[in-house]
Amino acid sequence: RRQSAPSSDSAWKWVEWNVVVMIAARMHSTRLPGKALLDIEGKPALLHLLSRLRRASVPKAVVLCTSTHPDDQVLQPLAEQAGVGFFAGSEDDVMQRFLDAAEREQAEHVVRVTGDDLLVDPAYLDRLVLHHIREGAEYSCMPGLPKGMECEAVSVEALKKAKRLAEDSSWSEYMTWYLKVPEVFR
């Protein structure tokens, strides 16, 4: 779907973005396995998050990004039920998974959300993206939000640069930590 910035920000009203929200989720959490399917008010936890993210105005798409591990395929019906995209990629390299999904979606910018950040506010997500684009940032976040509401915006070019600079993919699950180095990324 094609979207423009929220009408409350008239200077950006007719600008269309090539931004995709990507949710990193899997079934093999070490602290709480299967947390994506935990029941909250009669629905899986992840379905609540996907439904919230669909209410954001600025991104052109929302994609659930998981791994090719057979156990993670149970997440695809949730993506379909929520009306969002689904992508299964590298099991061990989350950064590569996001890059592959971004390529498929032809995204210029990605908003990274983890599957356990169930309370991401679509309005804050939109504000984050607008700030990210206005500032020409490679990486943006909204510090100070309570746990569970966090999301991060990153240009696909910066993500590619981080991938090239990475010595190994073992830290890939925490891919945006490296992007927080101001001497390397804006």
Task: Set out the residue ranges of the language-model regions.
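N-terminal glycine-rich phosphate-binding loop and ensuing alpha1 helix
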Residues: 17-66
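Short aromatic/hydrophobic "clamp" motif used to bind/position activated sugar donors
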Residues: 110-111
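Active-site oxyanion/phosphate-handling segment shared across diverse enzymes
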Residues: 157-186
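Short beta-strand-to-loop element that shapes/binds the nucleotide-sugar donor at the catalytic cleft/hinge
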Residues: 140-154
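Conserved donor nucleotide-binding strand/loop of the catalytic core
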Residues: 80-93, 103
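Acidic donor-binding segment of Leloir-type glycosyltransferases
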Residues: 57-86
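Acidic metal-phosphate-binding loop of nucleotide-sugar-dependent transferases
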Residues: 92, 117-119
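Conserved donor-nucleotide/metal-binding helix-loop-beta segment in metal-dependent transferases, i.e.
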Residues: 122-144
